[in-house]
């Protein structure tokens, strides 16, 4: 199951603790990428946050991984389930 997770930090919440959490995100991501749980990691230009693509076995696993994130308590999350468009059957055009 793949999910696009967009996390954003409110500017009003930027503090020393938040900055430390953000700086820990790279180290947090490395083992997740090595294990294949995170398959893409992006910065959203003009935003305080990022977009990560997770590949997990269940909703519960995704929730557990998000809760382990250093920015979990400082961020707002949007989670979108993804479907692989290359494996979907193509419907013929309507006549």
Where are these regions (language model features)?
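Conserved, structured core segments of small domains
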Residues: 1-95
């Amino acid at each position: 199951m793949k999910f696009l997770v967009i996390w954003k930090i409110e500017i009003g919440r930027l503090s020393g603790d938040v900055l430390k959490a953000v700086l820990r995100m790279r180290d947090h991501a490395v083992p997740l990428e090595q294990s294949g749980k995170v398959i893409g990691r992006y910065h959203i230009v003009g935003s305080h946050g990022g977009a990560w693509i997770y590949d997990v076995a269940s909703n519960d696993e995704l929730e557990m991984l998000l809760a382990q994130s250093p920015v979990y308590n400082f961020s707002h999350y949007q989670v979108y389930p993804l479907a692989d468009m290359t494996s979907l059957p193509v419907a013929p055009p309507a006549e």
